[in-house]
Amino acid sequence: MAEASERLYRVEYAKSGRASCKKCSESIPKDSLRMAIMVQSPMFDGKVPHWYHFSCFWKVGHSIRQPDVEVDGFSELRWDDQQKVKKTAEAGGVAGKGQDGSGGKSEKTLGDFAAEYAKSNRSTCKGCMEKIEKGQVRLSKKMLDPEKPQLGMIDRWYHPTCFVKNREELGFRPEYSASQLKGFSLLSAEDKEVLKKQLPGVKSEGKRKGDEVDGADEVAKKKSKKGKDKDSKLEKALKAQNDLIWNIKDELKKACSTSDLKELLIFNQQQVPSGESAILDRVADGMAFGALLPCKECSGQLVFKSDAYYCTGDVTAWTKCMVKTQTPSRKEWVTPKEFREISYLKKLKVKKQDRIFPPETSAPAPPHLPPSVTSAPTAVNSSCPADKPLSNMKILTLGKLSQSKDEAKATIEKLGGKLTGSANNASLCISTKKEVEKMGKKMEEVQAANVRVVCEDFLQDVAASTKSLQELLSAHSLSSWGAEVKVEPVEVAAPKGKSAAPSKKSKGLYKEEGVNKSEKRMKLTLKGGAAVDPDSGLEHSAHVLEKGGKVFSATLGLVDIVKGTNSYYKLQLLEDDKESRYWIFRSWGRVGTVIGSNKLEQMPSKEDAVEHFMKLYEEKTGNAWHSKNFTKYPKKFYPLEIDYGQDEEAVKKLTVKPGTKSKLPKAVQELVGMIFDVESMKKALVEYEIDLQKMPLGKLSKRQIQAAYSILSEVQQAVSQGSSDSQILDLSNRFYTLIPHDFGMKKPPLLNNADSVQAKVEMLDNLLDIEVAYSLLRGGSDDSSKDPIDVNYEKLKTDIKVVDRDSEEAEVIRKYVKNTHATTHNAYDLEVMDIFKIEREGESQRYKPFKQLHNRRLLWHGSRTTNFAGILSQGLRIAPPEAPVTGYMFGKGIYFADMVSKSANYCHTSQGDPIGLILLGEVALGNMYELKHASHISKLPKGKHSVKGLGKTTPDPSASITLEGVEVPLGTGIPSGVNDTCLLYNEYIVYDIAQVNLKYLLKLKFNFKTSLW
């Protein structure tokens, strides 16, 4: 059963007379029965109710099949009102006579379903995503756009056959028939007959006499009678219980003030909630069933919600308690002596009893969500049908493509997308490299709108590849700019407001027209200690205040997987660049979306501004601004150590196109440019769902990344020990708060298995290397006389020389590449583009003690291009102590291979980005500890210097050559004779960084054999 907070609908008695009905706009009187649909707020990370008069709610059209399961607050209603809601839901809501003139029950017109002839060929079927041709019969279900609820209900059209397929999900009940569709009477007689056959109404009838077999019907009747008697008894008990509770509430309202009720709760050691009705509910529950004892797991307060008692406490500062029970521990409810003067309390005697619950019913499939529709857009179109990967995306085409415009349009529409002629409306641009280089007026508009440009091959690959949309976008990208691709919002079924005109104030969650600046990557204006948020409108006239060495800017995060929230809160104290004027700017919302808002307040003085800033910070975090040791409190935000340092402009200078000043060989220049390519770093982070708006590239501190590693270690331990759900939930909340992720409107996934831990470890490994690369870009010399390439080259602290293609050295390496390409790695061939001889500063000196060790081999090590700035400047490193051992088959060490393709797979190239880098290192292996299966090595056995994971295939040892005492295993792969191993190929692991001396770096081209990889 869904928790109350997750239910789409809510019912209650109006707490005041302030709310207005979304259908008729009239006020809803206090204490009258009202119903709501819960919609995502465009202003903050949470849902809000859209209230209706009870009768108006049904007029706008809803399909509630089980009110006790689907409607929050149903069980708290008076018994008669519960029956009223049930009967109205069963009858399909309020409706008039059927359009064919009959007034029978089965012929009521269904207000939220319609039939008509398509007025144009512009509509798209929401079932198959194909066009509905003009003049064809089409059926609709009214649905709400969750991002723009003020637009009310919108018809979402289907082909009749697609509607029939999705009948149950759309809430078109078995007893409904085609003749109940609005507009049915306007169809031709022929089309009416076809629809009646496609959508017949099924009447519930008993068995015919001819169906009876050997008295089976009599047995069924007896069983049915017993079941009915049992249900009748339970229903009577539930009614009596409901009457008792409401009798207590009615009498308490007459006899006691709200202050009296609070006193009763405090005396019985119950928490006092906010709101008069909640206080009354708690007192009535205690009087009827006894005072609730604290939760056994966290000592929190248990509270009745629809189907059980839920704990409202917190197991830790990060996570709420998950305890839910129908049989909570209680003690006797005690009325204080001074309250016995109240006649009702004096004579009230309730027999001790347990609360009765209706039998649990599984929630029906949400009627408002067709299979191809999600509640809100995400950064990647993961929820669309497999054959419609571009669903809800607008595509712009520019330049001369191999297909004609009509062919391209047909291809895009077949994949679920729409063609657009405006850069401002586009999700994506398809063009050519030539057009990007030419940079014509249209392409300038695309760049200004920050729309990503991809090559035409993207259309072919997106139709066939099993890779995620985001990976394919990264692989086929042609532009150095481009925000994360957003799809158009899709709708969920919900009621219609009175007016269909959009509110001028409300932007909705995702703009369809124009470009929302917060949807694209922000340009941060850096002044002094931090970046001024551009949403403040003061980025060119003010700066962030710095006082006493502290920058008055804070970025806070809060993740609650249970509630599905992924929130941020930003706070800045801004000072005018010229005058003594001060502002407090704050913004809040959901990470990875444009849900949220902001506020700019001008303050009377600097002192007032500082005081207000500190007050807000403490209110949001529970900690004083100047507190040295931060303490996390439940439901409070946590500060992210995001450094919007002063060196952003320096990075831009160093990443501009190199001039002619560099004396480095062309191949080395290209290599350095590749290693320090900021766009590649961004792409890598986008693949990991890192939010580049809340956590710009290179801004998360190393300390925070290490803290995230520690959490993953705890997750690994919790998973392996089978820890409680609460502990897993707590660790997941902590991790996602520390490392902001962009999940769009999806709930953050739990980190509850080894695979998810391994994926996040890999993400943090890359984050650390990218942090190193970005730190190198920002730091060091600011010598404007040097070419940017030379400046970056010096930061690598590595001597890089190009190896002559015709040399014997190059021939040996090319042979090593050719011979050791494994037969199972057959998706690509490797082409050696350049070979570089490398010597890292200080590495040969560090390696010197191991130079005399026997068994030294030249082995492969592959990694992402984005990691090479860190590798060359700091060497190959072992995972930090904080990192979990999961993902490292033989523990934390440096891994090598003797088969080139085994290492090449770690380069993470793709057809759209086929160039990778791979290393050859001299590795001092000495005595090897040979293993056939995973073993988390923390310390090698005595006398061993390394680990060898034995593979089933090995380079032919007879073909190995020795160069300067180092074995080069360049033979072709042959069976090793080791069969009972879990490895296909050998792995070599050393646990001391000094045992590695990097010798060569190869630039490889991965020639993929087919686009269907």
From Swiss-Prot:
N6-acetyllysine sites (modified residues): 97, 105, 131, 599, 620
PTM-bearing positions, type N-acetylalanine: 2
Annotated stretches, region: Zinc ribbon: 290-332
Q: Which residues bind Zn(2+) 1?
A: 21, 24, 53, 56
Positions with a binding annotation for Zn(2+) 2: 125, 128, 159, 162
Entry GO CC: chromatin; cytosol; nuclear replication fork; nucleolus; nucleus; site of DNA damage; site of double-strand break
Q: Would the keyword Zinc be found if you checked this record's keyword annotation?
A: yes
Q: Where does Zn(2+) 3 bind?
A: 295, 298, 311, 321
Domain description: The two PARP-type zinc-fingers (also named Zn1 and Zn2) specifically recognize DNA strand breaks: PARP-type zinc-finger 1 binds PARP-type zinc-finger 2 from a separate PARP1 molecule to form a dimeric module that specifically recognizes DNA strand breaks. The PADR1-type (also named Zn3) zinc-finger mediates an interdomain contact and is required for the ability of PARP1 to regulate chromatin structure.
Q: What is this protein called in UniProt? A: Poly [ADP-ribose] polymerase 1
GN (gene name): PARP1
